[in-house]
Amino acid sequence: MLTSPSHLIRTLLLPCLVLLGLVGCAASQSSSAGASAVAPPKRVAIVLTNHGQLGDTEKPTGFYLSEATHPYEVFHKAGYEIDFLSPKGGEAPMDGVDRSDPANAAFLDDEALVARTKSTTSIAKAMTVPYDAVFFAGGHGTMWDFPDDPSVQRLIRTVYERGGVVAAVCHGPAALVNARLSSGMYLVADKQVSAFTDEEEIAVKLEAVVPFALESKLRARGARFVEAPNFEKKVAVSERLVTGQNPASATGVAEAVVELLEARRPGV
């Protein structure tokens, strides 16, 4: 029986078409797998103080605005998800409101962002979130509620021991003075650390108002304290602990956090 040319062509082409279909399907599946393997954005917590009174002076205090707005700007530019936390949750009072600072002005003009500082999430409610980094903003208020808060200490230990970055600036390192690892060692022990210095506290005439001298306390915990001249930038990076001396250091601390996070392999 003679086979028609068209039938012969179909017979020869069919295996090729099947093979092409299989290759295309495999490529599609590979592409889908690659897309699903893209790492989610990093997630960072900025922790603010709830404390609003400067000791017995009846003067207001809180978190120092630029020490939150400058890091927020850096983390936002890096594409990170950012949560605002505080020890108790709810309002975190602002201090150091200076609209001549562009980062402050942009933050204050964003009603949604300002609202988030008035309704922060309590650290206790955020403990199940796998943060890549936690950043403790400064401000004198931190000297009263950060050091002895169990949720602050637990958050630091959890993030650090999971391989994340712990960061703080100015008076934010008040969160570190009682923070211990599971081994019982202070996190700051034998690490380079910077913070608002005792000399700077004297310069702003608040050494008799704050409950303790931050630099001295960190040194007592075994930190290798490093500093710049008063009110000049100083950032210390020691393993996955990043600290800064004062408001001038806030951007540098955040940039160092980003550098550490971006150096990690995807999924690590």
Feature map (PLM): residue ranges:
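Bacterial N-terminal signal peptides that target proteins for export
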Residues: L2-L14
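Bacterial N-terminal signal peptides
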Residues: T11-G24
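Extended, subdomain-level signal for the structured scaffold at the beginning of enzyme domains
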Residues: A26-R162, V166, A174-V268
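Catalytic, metal-anchored helix/loop core of enzyme active sites in primary metabolism
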Residues: C170
